[in-house]
Each structure stands twice: as C-alpha cells, then as structure tokens.
Amino acid sequence: MAASARGLRTLQSAHSSTTVPRLQLAVSRCYATTTSPDPPITNSSNSSNSTPTPKQRITAFKDKLNAGPSFSDFVSGGGGGASNDRVPLDPAEAYALKTALVGPPGRKKQIIRLPSWLKTPIPDTPNYRRIKSDLRGLNLHTVCEEARCPNISDCWGGSSKSAATATIMLMGDTCTRGCRFCSVKTSRTPPPLDPHEPENTAEALSRWGLGYVVMTSVDRDDLADGGARHVAETVRKVKQKAPGILLECLTGDYAGDLEMVALVATSGLDVFAHNVETVEALTPFVRDRRATFQQSLRVLKAAKEARPELITKTSIMLGLGETETQLWETLRALRTVDVDVVTFGQYMRPTKRHMAVHEYVRPGVFDLWKERALEMGFLYCASGPLVRSSYKAGEAFIENVLKKRRGEGADGGDGGNSTRREDVERLVAGGVVR
C-alpha cells in the first residue's frame, strides 16, 4: 500500500510539472471559435465624418399604446366593432373578474381576490407604537394581534389617546380549543396563568385613560373553573383602579358551567359578550367540537338571569355558507334568550390551514341584516364587512346607553332598569343614533 501511494504521488507531481501556456491556449480557442475574418480597421477620421443613426423618440411607444384599444375595450368584450355594440358588464360578470389562478403549473387553483371594501391600511402611527410598547412591557396579549384583526390600524391608531383602544386577551395567548376560523395558538397543555395579569391589566387600562374597554380570553378547558375566577378578579382590579371605566368581557362558555358564567356576570362588568359565531347548522364545521350552539344560548341566558340589567351581546360571521333562512332562525333563537346586541362581520381566512371563505358578502347585505335585527327588537346591531365582536363600531352606542342608565340611577330614577325601547328613544332624540 505504501509503495502504491508513493507511485500515485510521483504521477501527480509529474502531471503538475507540465505547464500549458495560457496565452497560446487562449489564442487557439479564439481561432477555434472564429468563423469570419477580423473586421477591417477603420480610420478614426473617417468614422467621425459618418452620419449618426437617428434615435427613435422615447414617446413613440407611448403614442402607439394610446392609439390602440383601451382597457374598456377588453373588459367589455369589444373588438373593432362600433361602440354602441359594446354591452357593459353586469355586477356578476364584473365580480368574476376578481378571481385569479395561483399555484405551480399543473396544480393551479382559482381564488377570489380580496374585495376593495376589505382592504385596510398598514398600522404605523404613534398611538399604535405606544399601545404595543405598553403591552410588551406589561407582558399582556391582545386578540387584535393573535386573531389578526383587520381593524388593528383603526383601533390602535386613533388620532388621540381616547380614540385609540385595544382588546386585552386574558389567560395567555394559547387556547385549548381549535376552531377552524381562529388563528389563536392551540395546545392541550397551555402555560399556567400569570398571577400578575389582573394587576397588570388594570394598570395598562388605567394608563390609557379610555372610557370603554373590551377584555376577552382564550378557552382554558385545562382549568377546573375554565378561568372564570381569573377573569372575575381582573374585572374587580380594573374597576378599583378606574371606577368610571365601562367594561365589556367577551367570554368563553366555561364548558357549560353556568355557575362560572354567573360568577363572571356579577363581577362588576357592564357588558357580557359571548359569540355564537355562526348558525347552528354550521357550528360543528366551524367551531371546536366542545362548543355547541345550544350551549352558547344557555350561557347568554344564564348571564342575563344573573343580572337582568346587564347588556348581553353576541356576534355572527357571514360568508361561511349560511343561508338566509338559517340566519333568521339564529336571530329568533337569540331573541328568546333576550340578547341585547348582535354584530355581523365578514369571515376572513387567517391562514391556508383554516377553512376557506365561501363568499365575500357585499356591504348592502350587511345593511339589510342590520335593519332586520333592529326590527326584531335588538337594542343595537353593528353590521359591516369589517365589524368584529370587539370592534369599536358599536361601543359608542353601548357606552351612551350605559351612561344614560347610570345618570338615571344617580338622579333617583329607575336605578338602571330602563327598558330597551326607552333607551333607544332617548338616544335617537339626542342624535346619537341615526
């Protein structure tokens, strides 16, 4: 083996000692690839006397485009015919143009482009950065970020301190349930509760100086009480630090434990919110299997029975494939448990792992369902493509209702037990409601 190795090294050194002249090799390659003789050398004086080739005007291409067919010629299907032969697109055909084919070759699929009424600006304002800094400093979470809410630029980027708001998410950023529409992280064993969260939440809300605040929470089926005592303690801490603040809590169903529902409802909050999310027929396909439509109705009913003067609220997503008949049945079911406020919003797919959007509902349809809800006796209805259950679109109205009730109680009135019709009539007379 040693002798063969020495022989191999000797052979390698012999090859390396043979050098190939680089210039000669380059010249040989040049001759090998040249098929025509060298161009003649021209005198510089002759080239200077030659007439330069005229350059085409830069605008020549633009002139040709302007003289050609316009964009309307393409979308209207018109070619070279007369203009009176071109038929404008109807709404269905125009809407069909908002589709696109995406994906690799052979596996392309058609998607619907996001309608213009669902596009929002990128958040970047001083108030947005201030709220984000406060949340990070106090180790707090918001549903605005975790659920990828499209209204974050509006809610966090208010022009003034009182105009900006955020929805605090209690009990961490990890949920024990996996609804197909929600982008919040899920785990069977989420981190333990932060014992300082109630105090930190109260500190943040008192620092912002807001008049109306929404708190929500993840579902914690790993806890015996579902986190109800933690939520109730947070409400009490907030009311101690900011007694004048109006507080709305968007809660889970606490696995159907109505005692825990009553505990939260009587903790001092002003609005009890729990979302049914969709119609009953679609609930098994949209929500986690542990959440049912009838259980949500029982939660809303129990909260109202625990405090009859408490405003109860729920939210419904459109665009999941629900029918008009199913929506009517849902509203009737909500009225049977005396729900005061309902909101309608467009479902928007957060990631490819979540269920697809069945339909982008037009703004006019949202306006129609708002009228129908008010006719059925709901105290208020916020309805629109970008409306969310904790969006501030309906908070101004509810805030005025609560302030009216507080004022009546202080003046020796009915102590906050005014009826739904009286509240609405007073606010209409005052110009608050249109």
From Swiss-Prot:
Do you know which InterPro entries this protein is assigned to?
Aldolase_TIM, Elp3/MiaA/NifB-like_rSAM, LIAS_N, Lipoyl_synth, rSAM
Bound cofactor: record note: Binds 2 [4Fe-4S] clusters per subunit. One cluster is coordinated with 3 cysteines and an exchangeable S-adenosyl-L-methionine.
Instruction: Read off the SMART domains from this record.
Output: Elp3 (SM00729)
Q: Which domain of life is it from?
A: Eukaryota
The parts of the chain that form a coiled coil are none
Q: So where does [4Fe-4S] cluster 2 get bound?
A: C175, C179, C182
> PANTHER family, alphabetically?
LIPOYL SYNTHASE, LIPOYL SYNTHASE, MITOCHONDRIAL
Any idea what this protein is called? Answer: Lipoyl synthase, mitochondrial
Query: Which species does the entry assign this protein to?
Result: Paracoccidioides brasiliensis (strain Pb03)
